[in-house]
Design a protein with these regions (language model features):
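Phosphate/diphosphate ligand-binding glycine-rich loop within oxidoreductases
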Residues: 52-59, 66-187
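Rossmann-like adenosine-cofactor binding region
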Residues: 248-331
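Glycine-rich phosphate/diphosphate-binding loop of Rossmann-like nucleotide-binding domains
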Residues: 62-80, 187-275
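Adenosine-phosphate binding glycine-rich loop
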Residues: 313-361
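Glycine/threonine-rich flexible loop motifs
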Residues: 135-148, 207-211, 280-300
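Phosphate-coordination loops involved in phosphoryl transfer and adenosine-cofactor binding
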Residues: 51-57, 194-196, 313
């Protein structure tokens, strides 16, 4: 698809988010989201340069990463900056964020020292930390309830003592960089996405996956004022507070938000179908039972050619990595509806746009 912007005659306004943190796209106004999309598209089209020369990003990955790490490092390098990625517990100390903790266990450095020291050596910090990504929800649940993990304590404690902007590279609750990349892809493909139909569909998966990415993919359409449908089986609703915030924002933008388990109605004439598996919050901490109870959903809750045909010319999105013929069939993933490669590439351009906007002016 062409990288040119919707309105190429109007140069993108320079974004200035200097000094701001980015934990979710709710930290941004809808106008700021659109500004970042315009900036990303202008960077992709070669219409502007990110102001990153001499800038340094520290990237702290508690969890594995492919697209996020490469997109952030590439964004910095392409525009004259640099990125330093570290993995706590592997090539750094283990970190502690609790207050008043007697550190006689396996943590060696407290966030009170860590955050100011790191942030005096760089211009922004990106952090990926989720107890639910790597070990899975079952083991993650052993570290606390969903409500406790959704507080993203380490991220917020780091922000408290940081002296430069902090970017969330995925937490237990949010993944804003994925959200911005998805929004950019939607605007590229649809032009004017307002009031167009977006479907976020749950899919079967052998594991109970975290909700951070579907929460943020939901916001990718909400921030564009689309008519949004969350398609999921009974018992697989997203976090109620996230749904409340999403509904409040999308209605203010003239769009709508509904939930349904009616796949026939949801797929019909959809402009965008975004697939993602996630675990049931109703089953949180009871994952073996969830696996048993959701087994009958396996064959029906997959994105296939027949379902995508109901959309007409709808596009298919997935954050990747994806399990072929579990979440989506080969025919869809490799076919005319699929935009997943553009979506993944846009992680680069949105990362560059975010760092450009956050850079000290």
């Amino acid at each position: 698809m062409p990288a040119s912007r919707t309105n190429p005659d109007r140069p993108p306004e320079p974004m200035n988010l200097s000094g701001r943190n980015l934990i979710s796209t709710l930290d941004l106004s809808p106008e700021e989201v659109r500004g970042l999309i315009d900036s990303a598209r202008a960077l992709k089209a070669g219409e502007k340069e990110a102001r990153l020369a001499g800038r340094v990003a520290a990237l702290v990955f508690f969890n594995p990463s492919v697209r996020t790490r490469i997109s952030c490092e590439s964004a910095m390098a392409r525009y004259g900056g640099s990125a330093i990625a570290v993995q706590p517990g592997k090539d750094t100390w283990n970190f502690e964020c609790g207050e008043g903790v007697v550190m006689d266990g396996n943590t060696q450095e407290h966030v009170r020292e860590l955050a100011p020291v790191i942030t005096r050596m760089c211009h922004f910090v990106g952090i990926r930390k989720s107890e639910l990504i790597t070990v899975g929800s079952a083991q993650g649940a052993a570290t606390g309830s969903y409500d406790e993990l959704a507080k993203d304590e380490f991220l917020h404690r780091f922000m408290e003592f940081a002296e430069v902007p902090v970017v969330n590279l995925e937490s237990n609750r949010w993944h804003p960089m994925q959200s911005l990349a998805d929004s950019t892809t939607i605007v590229e493909r649809l032009g004017k996405p307002e009031k167009k139909k977006y479907v976020l569909t749950w899919t079967w998966h052998p594991k109970s996956l975290p909700v951070a990415t579907p929460h943020s993919q939901l916001m990718s359409a909400v921030n564009l004022g689309m008519d949004v449908t969350v398609l999921r089986p009974e018992g697989y609703g997203l976090e109620p507070e996230v749904m409340r915030l999403a509904r409040e924002r999308v209605e203010a933008l003239g769009g709508s938000l509904q939930e349904t388990d009616d796949q026939e109605a949801a797929y019909k004439d959809a402009d965008v179908v975004c697939a993602k598996a996630w675990g049931s919050l109703d089953y949180y901490g009871r994952f073996e039972q969830e696996a048993i109870d959701k087994a009958p959903l396996r064959d029906d809750w997959i994105v296939d050619e027949e379902k995508m045909a109901k959309t007409g010319d709808g596009i298919f999105l997935h954050c990747l990595p994806v399990r072929r013929n579990i979440v989506v069939t080969d025919g869809v993933l490799d076919g005319r509806h699929s935009a997943v490669k553009d979506e993944a590439e846009n992680r680069l351009w949105t990362a560059a746009a975010v760092f450009d906007a956050l850079a000290p002016k």
